[in-house]
Amino acid sequence: MKAILAIFTGFFWRVITAVALCFIALFGLFFQRPQVTAIVEKNGSLAGVDALGRQTTSAGKSDKQVGLFYFVWAWDTGGPYDNTKIVAADPGATDSEEAWIAAGGGPLYNFHFWGEPLFGYYVNTDDWVYRKHCQMLTDAGVDFLVFDATNAYIYENALAVMLPVWYEYHIAGWDVPKLSFYTNTESGRTMNEIYDAYYNNAALQALYPRLDELWYRWPDSGKPFIVGDAGDPVLRPEVRDYFRIRRNQWPNFSKEKDGFPWMEFDRHMTLNAVYGRRGRGSVMNVSGSQHNDTVRMSSTAWYGGNDRTRAWHGKANDPDPLALLGGANFTEQWDFIRKLDPDVVFITGFNEWVAQRQPAHPGEPIVFVDSADTLCSRDTEPSAGILGDNYYMQMVDEIRKFKNGMDKQAPGLEVYYDYENDIADRDARGFGNTPYQDFSGRNDITRMTVRREGAKFILTVETRDALVAGPNWMTLFINANGTASGWEGYDYVVGRETPGLVERSAGDWEWAPVGMADITIEDSMITLEIPRAMLGDVIGFQFKWADNYIPGDVYSFYTSGDAAPMGRLNFRYSEACE
């Protein structure tokens, strides 16, 4: 920056210096790390409605920080074995080893899924999945990921696939979650290996010259952050000096002074669940469920244990299905966290789909520790099962509430951006060598605008390359009132079957024509002129552009073609912005 500023004198020097100082003052004090202009900030807060009708708004910029425990240990061990499906098909499957195997379960130490991910039973080298995760977690307002290296593996095969995706979007200006690690077993050796493989790797640095900008830095030191045992005699001095090391904190161990918790048992929802001094990087954990009673989620799933499931609240597990679907346990913890107002919240977790089958416990022939089935699991990633994207959307909204994020657009905002190169093909193998292919990417949406001229709204959408025609082509979805009315919250759709045709929701995937908008199509841009009266004379709305989606399937906004923004989230427009 100094070299750049040196070429300016007089007026220009003063202007640029003032801008730089303002930028640092506003955004840099808490992080104490290099900053890049983040495109996602230009989009303001996103909003949407989940399957339960709950309204969601994403966070704006804040000094508060949110980290996410991120798991990359899913490599193919056969199957796929899906515990929820196995027991649903044969309730006696957990009676014995023989019954388990006969019902389609896997042997000891094999990975078993607690349920089916929305993206399929993927493995940790599927770059298509990482591309989705990068968008979802950036949109959610997650500030940093913590890779689970607690079992002394550093997952170089997985990160060799993930890092290029993260780096691509970081360089493009997106404020992607920064990266860090959590060690426990053989902590010193593991931290040494992590340092050598990622932080002090000349070959990696040559491939990604700005890689240092991707490492999460703890606020009180500005050093790259890692969780581990700084007193481990195996830890090399240069590694100890390089990192800001916070102590690995297990939920069933005594509280460490500088601990970093990944879950709480006895300290759950008490003042003892805060680690560190407020204003100095204090941190609390929130998780989808806790295996506090038996330390075996399978015990509560199948054998009468009383671990805190997803449906736990008010000191008991609630049998009401809405407690499970609505994340009662998750909600209760977030409510408590906001009362104590720490600087950092660490969420457990995301993409923790698998657990290894463990040796039998007396009276419990089939044992899993961290996750067992839909109820007794803690993942916030969207599921192909009954949870759908409820927990992801809830996480987005809870992050916004914790950060006291913006509920409305920034003044003058009428330009919106989407991630480029998010229509890449998928041709991968998952667990059990299951093939996963997706070639639905067609038009890569990049930039959108909205403005009002007199009695009409003018919307544009641009794509990276010339527009390609086809079914379910470049459709505009509008939520006119911010509620769950219409189809999945969308009250109007434009261009669903005929370019320019405005239709109003008649319930489910049924639509009634309202009129024709003027439409201009040229090369890589579409312009719509929609009379405001066709949209009920609204002064603001939420909207999404989607191409090559699956009609009537809201989850195809995650999985098919291109949706801007992704999933159920929408951009927000208000005349007050102009």
State the predicted function of each range.
Residues 409-418, 477-497, 523, 533-578:
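Acidic/polar low-complexity flexible segments
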Residues 33-416, 513, 530, 536-538, ...:
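Glycan-processing catalytic domains of CAZymes
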Residues 446-450, 514-519:
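Beta-strand-rich interaction surfaces with strong enrichment in secreted/lumenal proteins
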Residues 2-18:
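N-terminal Sec-pathway targeting helices
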Residues 455-465, 526-531:
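Short, well-ordered beta-strand segments enriched in hydrophobic/aromatic residues
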Residues 430-456:
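Low-complexity, acidic Ser/Thr/Pro/Gly-rich terminal tails and inter-domain linkers that flank the onset
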Residues 469-478:
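Beta-strand acidic-aromatic groove motif in beta-rich domains, primarily in extracellular
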